Amino acid sequence: MISSLLQVALGGALGASARYLTNVGSMRLFGPAFPVGTMIVNVVGSFLMGVLVVVLAHKGNRYAPFLMTGMLGGFTTFSAFSLDAVTLYERGQAGLAAAYVGLSVGLSLAGLMAGMAAVRGWMA
């Protein structure tokens, strides 16, 4: 358990650092008009999650805590969201997958807006 926790912590630090560098680099290249860095991180993270799911299924998942939960979790949680949605779809639960995607996005946006409204009201 401690070994897995350390793997997740180290991977998370590396993933978060990679996310930060990607965002800083994209801001310098493309400017702040569109969140290119976040889009890059989400697409690349989802691609890498797809690669790791297949590779680790064949090679063993000894490094899954470091690579999947740690590095990709620190890099982007969108990769885990994408994996969950595709897993539901591949299990033949397309309706549940669609509901998961819709609810996740909708409720996350609502949660963000509620948090912002709560703090703005408190700080006013």
Curated annotation (Swiss-Prot):
It comes from the Bacteria. One of its GO terms (cellular component) is plasma membrane. Signal peptide: none annotated. Pfam families: CRCB (PF02537). InterPro entries: FluC (IPR003691). One of its GO terms (molecular function) is metal ion binding. It catalyses: fluoride(in) = fluoride(out). Its main location: membrane. Na(+) binds at G73, T76. The chain crosses the membrane at residues 36-56, 63-83, 99-119. It is found in: Cell inner membrane. One of its GO terms (biological process) is cellular detoxification of fluoride. Keywords: Cell inner membrane, Cell membrane, Ion channel, Ion transport, Membrane, Metal-binding, Sodium, Transmembrane, Transmembrane helix, Transport. It is a multi-pass membrane protein. Na(+) is not transported, but it plays an essential structural role and its presence is essential for fluoride channel function. Belongs to the fluoride channel Fluc/FEX (TC 1.A.43) family. Fluoride-specific ion channel. Important for reducing fluoride concentration in the cell, thus reducing its toxicity. HAMAP family: FluC. This is Fluoride-specific ion channel FluC. The gene is fluC.
